[in-house]
């Protein structure tokens, strides 16, 4: 194992460790024409039919849930990708026949302050004319309002995962999940009303 590229907390890094310092790079859309030029099977993969292709709208999660690795993998600082770049990436995939999108964010709406970002993205998807898509995401049901729920449905949300880990507020607190079950229930009702 001495030659492996890994790091163990509390030990000196081994030679050959790969580590990328954070950079202030702006996220740009994937260039799927380029990807197809180096991976000829891309279109074969996309022709497979009913599936979701991942698109990331942001990285990071501000929460501190005791069991989750997202804050280790992506960090606690949320970095929102520019709406124009996310929509450009979706447009490229759409033009290649993709209609199913999975927003691969740790949380599509990680906190209430990101509600407007989510609304702006969904409005841009509408403005781009991507009206026959369906999409899915992980969401925290404590970070919704009625307008956002309606936009989610109007833009093709077909599936979402809400991590309601426990019906016990005490257990939610002990797991450091940071939400109120009553708020989650009320916002789930918003989603039901939105359709």
Regions found by a protein language model. Name each.
Residues 83-194:
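Conserved SAM/AdoMet-binding glycine-rich loop
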Residues 1-96:
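Acidic, low-complexity intrinsically disordered segments
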């Amino acid at each position: 194992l001495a030659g492996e590229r890994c790091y163990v907390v509390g030990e000196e890094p081994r030679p050959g460790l790969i580590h990328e310092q954070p950079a202030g790079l702006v996220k740009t859309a994937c260039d799927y024409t380029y990807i197809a030029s180096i991976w000829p099977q891309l279109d074969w993969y996309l022709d497979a039919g009913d599936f979701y292709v991942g698109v990331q709208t942001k990285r990071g999660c501000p929460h501190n849930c005791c069991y989750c690795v997202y804050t280790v993998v992506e960090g606690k600082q949320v970095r929102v990708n520019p709406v124009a770049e996310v929509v450009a990436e979706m447009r490229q995939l759409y033009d290649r026949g993709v209609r199913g999108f999975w927003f691969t964010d740790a949380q599509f709406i990680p906190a209430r302050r990101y509600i407007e970002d989510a609304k702006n993205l969904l409005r841009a998807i509408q403005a781009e004319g991507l009206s026959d898509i369906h999409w899915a995401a992980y969401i925290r049901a404590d970070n919704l309002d009625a307008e956002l729920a309606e936009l989610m449905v109007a833009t093709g949300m077909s599936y979402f995962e809400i991590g309601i880990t426990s019906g016990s507020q005490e257990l939610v607190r002990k797991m450091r999940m940071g939400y109120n079950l009553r708020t989650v229930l009320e916002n789930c009702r918003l989603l039901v009303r939105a359709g």
